[in-house]
Amino acid sequence: MAGRRFGWSRAALLQLILGVNLMVMPRTQARTLRFVTLLYRHGDRSPVKAYPKDPHQEDKWPQGFGQLTKEGMLQHWELGQALRQRYHGFLNTSYHRQEVYVRSTDFDRTLMSAEANLAGLFPPDGIQRFNPNISWQPIPVHTVPVAEDRLLKFPLGPCPRFEQLQNETRRMPEYQNESVQNAQFLDMVANETGLTDLSLETVWNVYDTLFCEQTHGLPLPPWASPQTMQRLSRLKDFSFRFLFGIYKQAEKARLQGGVLLAQIRKNLTLMATTSQLPKLLVYSAHDTTLVALHMALGVYNGEQAPYASCHMFELYQEDSGNFSVEMYFRNESHRAPWPLTLPGCSHRCPLQDFLRLTEPVVPKDWLQECQLAGGPADTEVIVALAVCGSILFLLIVLLLTVLFRVQAQPPGYRHVPDGEDHA
């Protein structure tokens, strides 16, 4: 009996210790991934154009200029596979149209990149296979005409205020110093390429062409030495900073990357309150799109976004019920994505803080903010006021004329009939 009583006491003591430990030990933070937005650059492509003296013209490229290559297709298929692994358990292993929405700019290379990416992300499984020998299924990619794209094709335009900011940027010391320091170099490149309108803002085209040719094993001309290529690469990165930074970066962001950021903020807020969007929203675009967004967010690393690089926005619901945003940038295929931290916030940024910190670079009315002081909108007001003023002036003149004539008639004057009847 004594042993039995001891056994019960030991069990009771164990329960007591476990109960105390459960109260003392902190609860594990349970987080739920609720929503993901991806923005990626297209994969490897042929050059957009050749320079006049280029020995490698468009006929050297199987599909012509600006087209996705087989290497680019593979890059995006591999990115799709990496995303499939990263979001395993969040996304269904097979494609469900209610879960995913993809939008691309209206360029062959971005549309095809999205399709290659989706092939890696959602290989058909079971009943989704329409042919047992084909491990692929069609998944919709949406787009709008380039002329109507006010979300993904940068720089956005026409925007008179942005053009004015660019003109003002050209007068900044940093831009002037670059112009002076590279004047002879640009003259040399212009002479070797046959280009007549080469500048700090257009020299990236030369680097892009040479880079594409070098990547695909085409011989470069003797003047395109490693030192020249390195210098061209630096000027290419400078051209991105000219577009979106150097001078009044926040205002430039409101007119450029802030437009896309506004849509991303709207989607994050909507998913935190109503869950009415797909779980995965994908944008397939360009290096300028990524740089514009990174400049608006204050996370730009100063370099061109490489092929198939991908910015990730992940919306989490914390154990407390509150929401937070985490950002990552995958710019290398052989390592995990880099965590990005919004200036002024932690990496795990509370949604309300994310919205507050990004508010200054989001336009309230893009069309209005694009107008110049005294621009078209103001001109319309001035014209309207001028018309109203002219009408008012004519009415006053007419009224004064009538009054003058009345006062000019002799006192007591009355019309006297002449006595004739007019039939």
UniProtKB/Swiss-Prot annotation:
The record places the following residue ranges in the Cytoplasmic compartment, namely 402-423
Instruction: Describe the processing and modification events after translation.
Output: The membrane-bound form is converted to the soluble form by sequential proteolytic processing. First, the C-terminal cytoplasmic tail is removed. Cleavage by a lysosomal protease releases the soluble form in the lysosome lumen.
Topology versus the membrane, per the UniProt entry? Answer: Single-pass membrane protein
Q: Is the keyword Transmembrane helix in the record?
A: yes
The record lists its disulfide bonds as C159-C370, C212-C310, C345-C349
The protein's matches in InterPro entries, at most eight in alphabetical order, are given as:
Acid_Pase_AS (IPR033379), His_Pase_clade-2 (IPR000560), His_PPase_superfam (IPR029033), Histidine_acid_phosphatase (IPR050645)
The protein's name: Lysosomal acid phosphatase
List of glycosylated residues: N92, N133, N167, N177, N191, N267, N322, N331
Q: Per the record, a Pfam family?
A: His_Phos_2
Instruction: Quote the gene name from the UniProt entry.
Output: ACP2
- The transmembrane segments are 381-401
Instruction: Please list which residues make up the signal peptide.
Output: 1-30
A GO BP entry is: lysosome organization
**The enzyme's E.C. designation:** 3.1.3.2
Catalysed reactions, as listed in the record = a phosphate monoester + H2O = an alcohol + phosphate
Query: What keywords tag this UniProt record?
Result: Disulfide bond, Glycoprotein, Hydrolase, Lysosome, Membrane, Signal, Transmembrane, Transmembrane helix
The record's subcellular locations are: Lysosome membrane; Lysosome lumen
Q: Where is the active site?
A: H42 (nucleophile), D287 (proton donor)
Tell me which parts of the chain lie in the Lumenal compartment: 31-380
Name the family the entry cites: Belongs to the histidine acid phosphatase family.
Record GO terms (molecular function): acid phosphatase activity
Query: Could you give one GO CC term from the UniProt record?
Result: lysosomal membrane
